[in-house]
Amino acid sequence: MTKNQTISPLSIIGVISAGLRIYRDHFRSYFNIALQAYCWSIIPIYGWAKFSALSALIGRLAYYETLEQPEVISEARSRVERRMWSFLGQGILVGLIVMGGIFGLTVVGGIFVGILVAILGQNNPVTYLIGFGIFIAILFAYIWLISRMYIAALPLAVEDNMTATAGISRSWKLTKGAVLRIQGILFLGFLIILPVSILVILIIVFLPLAFGIIVNPDSSTYKLIVNLFSVAINIIIGALFLPFWQSIAGVIYYDLRVRREGMNLTTNPIKDRKSGV
């Protein structure tokens, strides 16, 4: 493909394919960044801010890879880490918005179910049916909120003169009407990592049993070894998965900008792009 061709939106499969290619081609460098991020996350507050910034750094790098305008990691890192505390504040704010929204819906749903119980009785099948419907509605509301804010860190990481709250507003604007596409992308991503996730669960379950054969399970040494290995495994697995999801986020951010704004550029995304769906 030539460099002069105008960039186009990606299909759902195209987003996944692009994210996987970026993840594969830059695995070593992204894994190193993610490993640092998870090691920093052990330290309260400052470490959490570093984790947030380094996570966003991977998304930024993936975004520019999608544009075929790769950045030098050290330069991108210095730009992102200057907003370290903004990333932490944004993460807290997003968490509060999601929890507040779900809490409000739960309270309203609980009151409504309580009224139904008072009118119809606790053992009435209609009460259970409506209660289940409210639960499903709250679950979908949670998914909707998460989808609307999934790329909130990307505008803060990429765009100039951006604040934490403006990044959330930007994500809200870009994801309008795109919740189903985003969920389709995330669902396919989940299916891709599912085998590894199952393997990790098996390791976590059987690891204490394996150590129990070597070391007395009642000893303090056994507990120390198991805890240390559990922390190490969680860090390594997190460092494996984080670049994958951030690569996907970077490509989603690119795709949404193309769809919403046209991104009047003469640069191509990575080669296996497809028409949007």
Question: What do the PLM-derived regions correspond to, one by one?
Answer:
Residues P44-W48, Y128-W144, N234:
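Alpha-helical transmembrane segments
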Residues S55-Y64, I92-F112:
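Specific transmembrane helices
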Residues G91, G95, F135-L139, V231-G238:
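Hydrophobic alpha-helical transmembrane segments of multi-pass small-molecule transporters/permeases
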Residues M1-I7, I16-A18, F51-E71, L145-M162, ...:
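Juxtamembrane transition segments at transmembrane-helix termini in multipass membrane proteins
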Residues F112-I134, L207-L228:
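Membrane-interfacial helix-loop-helix connectors in multipass membrane proteins
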Residues K3, I7-W40, E71-G101, I143-I198, ...:
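Interfacial aromatic "cap" segments that immediately flank transmembrane helices
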Residues I102-G114, S197-P208:
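C-terminal TM-helix exit segments that contain a strictly Trp-centered aromatic cap at the helix terminus
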